[in-house]
Amino acid sequence: MARACRERAVLRWAAVALVVVTAQMFVPGAHAADPADIAEGMRLFRQKGNCQVCHGWAGDGRKMDSQMPDGANLRESMLDRETLITIIKCGRPGTGMPAYDKFAYSDGRCYGLKQADLKSPTRQMPDPPATLQVREIEAIADFMFAKIIGKGTMDREKCVDYWGSDVELCSELAK
């Protein structure tokens, strides 16, 4: 009898675990990122995408170039992964956020708009520093969810986690 109860309990826990794992596959933003993807995403955020110029190195909206538009404070963002990827691919017409998908407005894939629709002064967008492939956009999203999105104000502990060591920038932040 006790053995049968234990077996049922084990089966129940296994069923619950299966449901949780399966549900995570369908929840927006629930994505287990590989550490190598996170590192590559950070490199792309800082270099090829040059996201830090508008959003700041910490993603807090403190831009690094006064000539660039103000970027959103991503540390306080509540975006899900799918929406973030769409914004990186398609930009945000009428704002300073460029579209990193080379074909974003060639066929209506972004917000149902085409290149001709962006000629209106209220929908104009800057050109990105470079276009990105889907895998690169996904790596940036992985990095942002691991180190920036929803992480709150940058402090020394988060800075060390962000860089992987106690770099000089971190010493300027409160503990």
Each PLM stretch: what is its role?
Residues 1-11:
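N-terminal secretory signal peptides that target proteins for export/translocation
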